[in-house]
């Protein structure tokens, strides 16, 4: 696998992730099960974004010093583009978590505990998926066309799909788990397992955790190929992806109270997926520069947010008129 990642870069990335996760877990342990406030969520979100940008700046500086700016500039731009794509697509993941927690009636104080383990599991699963995907692409380059067609299909499907939490209980995964696990009827505080009459029971909280992990794998199948459209360097794909999902938990609590205000966002994300899919399909005929890709993704998100703001304004105006 061709990569700009050196032992120093890999080691530096690992140290940053381990330190930040340790601090996060330590604070979680001291405070116990409680909901993250909007102020805390905003603070952690800003911290993760700032840390990601600082890492990219350090990454650029290291490459500029060791290999020159002709290498550093496009690689740092690839990281930024991959990070923006993953961060954008992660919002849809957050909305699915909202539906899961609502359907299973998980109180806010326990949602944070589930998401701690959910993000840790996502780090492991995505790392495996990224290295496996990179290896497959190096062996079978035609897979990029498969990924492109898949993203094109997914984008159209996302735009047309209707989100409905009422059908969660009928999902094959949920039905299978309920049929094969000895499970309590109600959530037992913050426990994933409890003992009753000498028998070990799973709790609905474990079911929610498994569904959170499962939903992340499903979204990773979309987002990881999307970053492969920008670069196939495993270091950039992994670091941009993980930095984006490390801030997912804070993003969840930041958006959980205002999710209904982002009704148009899924259409913007759908357009991004369609654009990336087309980019991958036409790569042999026309190579879209990374800077153009970054501009297009940023432009789509900006236009979507402007339209979303206008829609909310019109809706609020109608409500006030009633």
UniProtKB/Swiss-Prot annotation:
Signal peptide: none annotated. It is found in: Cell inner membrane. Disulfide bonds: none annotated. Keywords: Cell inner membrane, Cell membrane, Membrane, Transmembrane, Transmembrane helix. Residues 28-43, 111-113, 157-198, 247-261, 308-321 are cytoplasmic. The gene is alx. The chain crosses the membrane at residues 7-27, 44-64, 90-110, 114-134, 136-156, 199-219, 226-246, 262-282, 287-307. Belongs to the TerC family. The lineage of its organism: Bacteria, Pseudomonadati, Pseudomonadota, Gammaproteobacteria, Enterobacterales. The keyword Cell inner membrane applies. It is a multi-pass membrane protein. Pfam families: TerC. Residues 1-6, 65-89, 135, 220-225, 283-286 are periplasmic. This is Putative membrane-bound redox modulator Alx. GO terms for cellular component: plasma membrane. Has been proposed to be a redox modulator.
């Amino acid at each position: 696998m061709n990569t700009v990642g050196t032992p120093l870069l890999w080691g530096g990335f690992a140290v940053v992730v381990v330190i930040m996760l340790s601090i996060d877990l330590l604070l979680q342990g001291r405070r116990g099960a409680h909901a993250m406030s909007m102020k805390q969520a905003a603070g952690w979100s800003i911290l993760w974004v700032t840390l990601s940008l600082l890492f990219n700046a350090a990454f650029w500086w290291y490459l500029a010093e060791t290999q020159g700016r002709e290498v550093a500039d496009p690689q740092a731009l690839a990281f930024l583009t991959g990070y923006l794509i993953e961060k954008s697509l992660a919002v849809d993941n957050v909305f699915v978590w909202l539906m899961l927690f609502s359907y299973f009636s998980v109180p806010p104080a326990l949602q944070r505990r589930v998401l701690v383990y959910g993000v840790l599991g996502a780090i492991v699963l995505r790392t495996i998926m990224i290295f496996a995907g990179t290896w497959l692409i190096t062996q079978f380059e035609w897979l990029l066309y498969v990924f492109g067609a898949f993203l094109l299909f997914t984008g159209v499907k996302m735009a047309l799909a209707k989100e409905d939490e009422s059908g969660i209980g009928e999902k094959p995964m949920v039905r299978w788990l309920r049929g094969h696990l000895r499970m309590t009827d109600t959530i037992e505080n913050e426990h994933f397992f409890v003992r009753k009459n000498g028998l070990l029971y799973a709790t609905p909280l474990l079911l929610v955790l498994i569904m959170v992990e499962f939903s992340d794998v499903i979204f990773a199948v979309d987002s990881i190929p999307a970053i492969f459209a920008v670069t196939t360097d495993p270091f950039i794909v992994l670091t941009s992806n993980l930095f984006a999902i490390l801030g997912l938990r804070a993003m969840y609590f930041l958006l959980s109270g205002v999710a209904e205000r982002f009704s148009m966002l899924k259409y913007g994300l759908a357009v991004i997926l369609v654009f990336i899919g087309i980019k991958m399909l036409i790569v042999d005929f026309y190579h879209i520069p990374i800077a153009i890709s970054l501009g297009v993704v940023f432009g789509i998100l900006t236009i979507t947010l402007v339209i979303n703001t206008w829609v909310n304004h019109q809706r609020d105006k109608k409500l006030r008129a009633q």
